[in-house]
Amino acid sequence: NETLEPSETKRQAKEMARIGMGGFFMHARGGLQTEYMGDEWFDNVEAAICQSEEDGTEAWAYDENGWPSGFGSGKVNGLGIDYQQKYLRFEDGEKQTDTTIVNKDGVHFYYDINPFYVDTLDSKVTHKFIELIYEPYYDKFKNRITGFFSDEPQISRNGLPWSFVMPQTYKEMYGDNLLDKLIELFKPVGDYKQTRIRYWKMVTDLFSNNFMKPIYDW
């Protein structure tokens, strides 16, 4: 990392082959001065691939500038709230925000936002990530890269995962109104056991189908 130079990138790739390593991952990390996914970045990727082809090693791309994978070095989450990670909390206290969900009993719920990561439950977010990161690599290098390393994609752990796609998805899966059931995710009332099982099944399906599967299919 720091400021990349193709000659130094080739030297490092060659050294890894010399000591018996079968390949390497091209991973942007803290301290990188070269613009990630810019022309100079790809010049260095080309240099590393060329050296791997000479040495018979494997050149793998890492799909993010840091981790967890999915935010596209800030370009995906930078598109706004629709693309940013969201979560629900249940807390006693005064009103904190105007971003409100109200259930049929008049209980107010508020979702909070992590602006530094993305909503991995919404497929449009994943397709934008693929467009900004995966497709430029393929356009430039085709099958000369062995594959991609994707690291720690995740749902929110700050509260219960939330996404704007959830109410409609829950309705389609269970024929029920999720907004009316939100209190059951936090308190042992109503059909809370069933609601929680359904909720986490939905979260699992959304993450698998809307984040992991599009990347796998690509």
PLM segments and residue spans:
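N-terminal-proximal low-complexity accessory segments that begin disordered
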Residues: N1-T34
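Mature extracytoplasmic enzyme cores
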Residues: E8-I19, M37-F211
